Regions:
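Active-site-proximal alpha-helix that buttresses catalytic centers in soluble enzyme cores
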Residues: 2-203
Length: 203
């Protein structure tokens, strides 16, 4: 019994150390990336026409990026909501895993009217290395009517097959270059603004 406890403790230490190393690497990568945008302009110089930002946000980070894009492009904005609230905690992870496996995504309260927009930004957090299931549900229903679509994701570090998955569901649209935003602290706000501007000006 003593040896079993010893090996269990050792396993916990090893896993914990690996987790800390991963967090350190992510933090270092974030710092390096944001340094590229330090002091750069956040001015949007490109005329995108009529713009809509569609997003889903569970924790608020995706909403923060969506709000920035909306403000910087003078866009309309639409937050997706599920018809029934998703569960929380461990049950959320199990529910999402099942939704992705069965491809039965949650029903939405309402869909945005996509009529007349030149560019539609679609934002999602990354769940299980792909887009959040409410966004996949939206894309299954959406007809972009020939508009240009630019995706953006928010994540801890790895977004897996996010881009391939959302592009595969996108109908009747010209897909523009995407952007990804790791979850970062407020100290990087100005750099994130500059990154958004750099991305949009390059579309």
């Amino acid at each position: 019994m003593k040896y079993v406890l010893y090996f269990l403790l050792l396993a916990v230490v090893v896993v914990g150390a690996a987790g800390l190393r991963h967090l350190y690497r992510v933090s270092a990568a974030n710092k390096c990336e944001m340094a590229q945008y330090a002091g750069k302009s956040a001015e949007i110089k490109k005329d995108l026409g009529r713009v809509l930002v569609v997003y889903y946000s569970l924790t608020g980070h995706t909403k923060e990026i969506a709000d920035k894009i909306q403000t910087m492009t003078n866009a309309d904005i639409f937050g997706l909501e599920t018809a029934k609230p998703l569960p929380t905690g461990a049950k959320l992870h199990l529910t999402v895993k099942d939704q992705l496996k069965t491809k039965k995504y949650p029903a939405l309260k309402q869909l945005p009217d996509l009529t007349g927009y030149d560019v539609v930004f679609v934002g999602s957090p990354v769940w299980w290395y792909t887009a959040a299931t409410p966004v996949l549900s939206f894309l299954e229903e959406a007809d972009f009517q020939g508009a240009k679509v630019a995706f953006f994701s928010t994540q801890g570090s790895n977004r897996g097959t996010f881009l391939q998955d959302v592009e595969a569901l996108t109908k009747n649209a010209q897909i523009l270059p995407d952007a990804s935003f790791n979850n970062m602290g407020k100290e990087y706000d100005a750099a994130v603004d500059a990154k958004i501007a750099d991305w949009i000006n390059g579309l």
